[in-house]
From Swiss-Prot:
Coiled coil: none annotated. Belongs to the UPF0145 family. Highly divergent. PANTHER family: UPF0145 PROTEIN YBJQ. InterPro entries: UPF0145_dom_sf, UPF0145_YbjQ-like. This is UPF0145 protein MJ1170.
Length: 89
């Protein structure tokens, strides 16, 4: 497992961004699950950091046709930019 640096800012003090790998998105039933999923996706891309992280949520309704009622579901999304950074000496 890579030590993943995560930040809501677009810069990391003491580090320089050497490569931008792209947008990453994770989702889950709570903010922590969404962030964990985001980190897994970034690791698979070869990133060692994710910058500009934002978390949002969406309320949807699942219709249960057999029982004729709706169940609300809240899904959290985490998104940011996967990057490779190097420590500045």
């Amino acid at each position: 497992m890579i030590l993943m640096i995560t930040s809501t800012t677009d810069n990391l003090e003491g580090f320089k961004i050497v490569k931008y790998l792209g947008v990453v998105i994770g989702y889950g039933d709570d903010p922590d699950d969404a962030l964990e999923d985001l980190i897994d996706v970034a690791e698979d891309m070869g990133a060692n950091a994710v910058i500009g992280i934002r978390i949002s949520n969406e309320l949807t309704t699942e219709i249960i046709s057999d029982e004729n009622y709706a169940v609300p579901e809240l899904t959290y999304y985490a998104y940011g930019t996967a990057v490779i950074v190097e420590k500045i000496d």
